[in-house]
């Protein structure tokens, strides 16, 4: 709530106070809303992982969690991983998607490719995908056959 307030309301308070609420929505909030919600969703996903970690309900008991971005030495391109947690030897990599479409297998493949940056420092890898709108059948099938993949949809997030 504070993020929304300071990002949109505080920055536009004069316009709002003078009756331009609709214009503020149309020109200032609406064009940026999905970007904003993506960041909020990432925070909710991190809170979910922290709660599960505290209960020992994840495949690792991590000691640190955060976001990572940097240069992939293999591709020389910039990479970003929404959530990365580790316990010193095992890693959990997470991708958070606030989209209206189901999360596709390409997101999982991309996450695994980005996680290769950490291949020298890890013993085991786990992958968690968070999706507002669920998962395609290909992702569901992959998760059924691979215990290192965790899927969390909006319904699961609402119940934790």
What residue spans do the PLM features occupy?
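Domain-level recognition of nuclease-like catalytic cores that cleave nucleotide substrates
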Residues: 128-160
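Acidic/glycine-enriched edge-of-secondary-structure segments
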Residues: 65-74, 93-106
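Active-site-adjacent loop/helix micro-motif of nuclease/hydrolase catalytic cores
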Residues: 100-112, 137-138
